């Protein structure tokens, strides 16, 4: 039995304490003054999976109201990437309406999903017709059922593969995401990368480490350098050939051919690109807000 850390309301580690202090030193913003290119919106905390790694495992938090969300979307600076997350955002029956509200406000709608509902192609088509432009598809086990069981507590490779195929068939831009867990799925980066290369709708591959937030597998998390080594070993790409875009202490962003690759040692504190909509209608730095409100919202 793999050791899991139970959800809790507050992080009393030095890292958690420093993050809470960091949040207090960051301003929050009115939506119309949002400086972040991406705003992450927790549209529901319900989920249809019980993954071993989940930064917000609290399922009792009520959904944000669609009308209120539309009002927030209308205030954001035009061209914002509005990323709808959960829980699992596809559990909202009004997800197409939320996507339309984002498009009507002249933004880019993005859905971050585990992909289970997107195994249904008519549903994917409905979201595309509503205006969905980009999907971030979680593939922690690539296409291997046993890896999904080990990381996400469910054998779901067939549905994940079908979701991947449906997004390609519906020509929806897709980012493939994987949480890389030490000694479990490092080798799965190779088939993930191969799939990204063969599907023209895939624009990005994002590998991240396990974050010690919420519920997580209690084993040493991969460092940023280790993530890079996992990637280069799996792909056969030499580190000195990577076309670097940006590197910080916790993230590495580069281009490899037509694909953008992001490596993130989670959490990426101090990120200047991602904000989070708070229940009060303000925009806060994403990672700082998640940690300072661990176990809640």
Residue spans for each PLM region:
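Hydrophobic faces of well-ordered beta-strands that scaffold small-molecule active sites
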Residues: 39-41, 82-84, 109-111, 135-137, ...
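Structured helix-beta-strand junction loops
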Residues: 78-79, 105, 130, 170, ...
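Short, small-residue-rich loop/turn micro-motifs
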Residues: 43-47, 139-141, 209
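Conserved alpha-helical substructure of the radical SAM core
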Residues: 13-122, 129
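Radical SAM enzyme [4Fe-4S]-AdoMet core and its adjacent flexible, acidic
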Residues: 149, 154-290
């Amino acid at each position: 039995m793999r050791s899991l850390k139970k959800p809790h309301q507050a992080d009393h580690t030095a890292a958690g304490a420093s993050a809470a202090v960091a949040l207090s030193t960051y301003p929050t913003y009115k939506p119309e003054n949002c400086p972040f290119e991406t705003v992450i919106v927790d549209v529901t905390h319900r989920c249809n999976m019980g993954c071993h790694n989940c930064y917000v495992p609290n399922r009792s938090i009520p959904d944000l109201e669609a009308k209120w969300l539309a009002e927030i979307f209308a205030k954001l600076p035009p061209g914002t990437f509005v990323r709808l997350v959960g829980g699992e955002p596809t559990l909202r029956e009004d997800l197409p309406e939320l996507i339309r509200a984002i498009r009507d406000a002249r933004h880019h709608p993005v859905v971050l999903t585990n992909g289970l509902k997107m195994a249904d192609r008519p549903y994917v088509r409905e979201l595309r017709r509503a205006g969905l432009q980009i999907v971030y598809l979680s593939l922690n086990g690539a296409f291997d059922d046993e890896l999904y069981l080990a990381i996400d507590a469910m054998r779901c490779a067939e549905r994940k593969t079908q979701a991947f195929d449906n997004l390609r068939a519906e020509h929806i831009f897709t980012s493939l995401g994987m949480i890389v867990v030490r000694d479990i799925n490092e080798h799965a980066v190779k088939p993930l990368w191969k799939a990204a290369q063969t599907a023209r709708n895939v624009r990005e591959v994002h590998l991240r480490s396990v974050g010690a937030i919420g519920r997580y597998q209690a084993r040493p998390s991969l460092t940023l350098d280790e993530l890079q080594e996992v990637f280069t070993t799996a792909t056969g790409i030499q580190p000195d050939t990577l076309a670097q875009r940006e590197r910080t202490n916790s993230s590495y962003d580069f281009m490899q051919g037509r694909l953008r690759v992001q490596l993130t040692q989670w959490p990426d504190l101090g990120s200047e690109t991602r904000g989070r909509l708070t229940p009060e209608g303000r925009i806060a730095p994403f990672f700082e807000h998640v940690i300072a409100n661990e176990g809640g919202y």
